[in-house]
């Protein structure tokens, strides 16, 4: 009998050995930045998936409380650094709502144009690295070639490829040249062909489908429970897009469709992103057509924006205004506001509390990736280890905005 109990102990010891913990990341190529997951595996099946975040935490929200509204703008480029201008947009909208500034029409169109370029930048990176995570080599090379062209458009508008600081409260920093508008138009004509090539390579690819179909399925209840937004919602069959449901800027004038999925799995989210790039290209083309007709200023001239260069050379008041604007900054009336934009990753929101001074009292940043990553344990449970990287890929996480 004593022998038997010993034998049982050995058996339970054997069973104890079956669940083992491994670290996924932070330097894993599929970890998309500095994600660290502690995975508990039963054989190859994921029992628990524990995300450890904070490796890129810079205290953005706290830093913002000690700087002027304009000095805070560049912090937004450094959140989701894959598509920087979309974040600046939310910050500018929040300030404009509190101060009651009307943005000139041309500036509004330029904002929409560059927000959509940002969406294409983001989805190109996501779709192609998603393919790379499951073993394809060609798509990332093609995707980065196209992103390079768009980065050049960023650079020609603002002088920077990545951290543009181009959107300003009251408009955009400077006007686009006619030549740039022509070049973007030329790119937009050729881009659908690139998407067709990507489509041909991935959409019906047997291996790509096996790795993505029925992986990470999300239901309507999950969406409401976890607070998903963006492609995570649309992939499950709900046409929820802030550009259509709560139009901001001048999105209500544009003709575009909202792609939705059916099963809510990784594959449907991939298809949504592919189609969204096509729709963004349509919006870009409509924008360019409108920009050719709409002339005018790109900044609402007043207390929020600097005076024109020429004026500063002749007017003392303009010079003083310029100096005060960049040292002390403008004052925003006391109040609170929530401004949200449909960023490429989902609903990016800024909850701004102003106390009437030249600095925000408190700014809360709602990063879509944060809410998506929360659910990784729930989504990945019961999947295989290899599926975890496919799931992370379609959650579309970037750590600038998650850790902020």
Swiss-Prot record:
Signal peptide: none annotated. Its main location: membrane. The keyword Ribosomal protein does not apply. It catalyses: a quinone + NADH + 5 H(+)(in) = a quinol + NAD(+) + 4 H(+)(out). Coiled coil: none annotated. Gene3D superfamilies: Cytochrome-c3 Hydrogenase, chain B. Its EC number is 7.1.1.-. Pfam families: Complex1_49kDa (PF00346). It is found in: Cell inner membrane. It is a peripheral membrane protein. GO terms for molecular function: NAD binding; NADH:ubiquinone reductase (non-electrogenic) activity; quinone binding. InterPro entries: NADH_Q_OxRdtase_suD (IPR001135), NADH_UbQ_OxRdtase_49kDa_CS (IPR014029), NDH1_su_D/H (IPR022885), NiFe-Hase_large (IPR029014). NDH-1 shuttles electrons from NADH, via FMN and iron-sulfur (Fe-S) centers, to quinones in the respiratory chain. The immediate electron acceptor for the enzyme in this species is believed to be ubiquinone. Couples the redox reaction to proton translocation (for every two electrons transferred, four hydrogen ions are translocated across the cytoplasmic membrane), and thus conserves the redox energy in a proton gradient. NCBIfam families: NuoD, PRK06075.1. Belongs to the complex I 49 kDa subunit family. This is NADH-quinone oxidoreductase subunit D. It comes from Cereibacter sphaeroides (strain ATCC 17023 / DSM 158 / JCM 6121 / CCUG 31486 / LMG 2827 / NBRC 12203 / NCIMB 8253 / ATH 2.4.1.).
């Amino acid at each position: 009998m004593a022998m038997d109990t010993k034998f049982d102990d050995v058996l339970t010891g054997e069973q104890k050995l079956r669940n083992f913990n491994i670290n996924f990341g932070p330097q894993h190529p599929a970890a998309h930045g500095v994600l660290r997951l502690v995975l508990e595996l039963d054989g190859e099946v994921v029992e628990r998936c524990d995300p450890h975040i904070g490796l890129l935490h810079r205290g953005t929200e706290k830093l913002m409380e000690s700087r002027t509204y304009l000095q805070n703008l560049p912090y937004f480029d450094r959140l989701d650094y894959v598509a920087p201008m979309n974040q600046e947009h939310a910050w500018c909208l929040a300030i404009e709502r509190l101060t009651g500034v009307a943005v000139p029409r041309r500036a509004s169109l330029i904002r929409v144009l560059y927000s959509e370029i940002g969406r294409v930048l983001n989805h190109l990176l996501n779709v192609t690295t998603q393919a790379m995570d499951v073993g394809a080599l060609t798509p990332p090379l093609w995707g980065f070639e196209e992103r390079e062209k768009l980065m050049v458009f960023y650079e020609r508008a603002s002088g920077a490829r990545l951290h543009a600081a181009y959107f300003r409260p009251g408009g955009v920093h400077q006007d686009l040249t006619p030549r740039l508008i022509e070049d973007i138009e030329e790119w937009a004509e050729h881009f659908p062909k690139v998407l067709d090539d990507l489509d041909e390579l991935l959409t019906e690819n047997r291996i790509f489908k096996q790795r993505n179909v029925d992986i990470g399925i999300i239901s309507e209840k999950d969406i409401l429970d976890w607070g998903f937004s963006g492609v995570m919602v649309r992939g499950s069959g709900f046409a929820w897009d802030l550009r259509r449901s709560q139009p901001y800027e001048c999105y209500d004038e544009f003709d575009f469709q909202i792609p939705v999925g059916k099963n809510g799995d990784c594959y449907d989210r991939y298809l949504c992103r592919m189609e969204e790039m096509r729709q963004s290209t349509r919006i870009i083309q409509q924008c360019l057509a409108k920009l050719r007709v709409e002339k005018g200023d790109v900044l609402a001239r007043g207390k929020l924006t600097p005076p024109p260069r020429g004026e500063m050379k002749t007017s003392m008041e303009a010079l003083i205004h310029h100096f005060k604007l960049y040292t002390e900054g403008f004052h925003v009336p006391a109040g609170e506001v929530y401004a949200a934009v449909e960023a490429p990753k989902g609903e990016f929101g800024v909850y701004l509390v102003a106390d009437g001074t030249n600095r925000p009292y408190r700014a809360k940043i709602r990063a879509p990736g944060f809410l998506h990553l929360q659910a990784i344990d729930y989504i990945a449970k019961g999947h295989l280890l290899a599926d975890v990287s496919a799931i992370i890929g379609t959650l579309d996480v970037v750590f600038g905005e998650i850790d902020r």
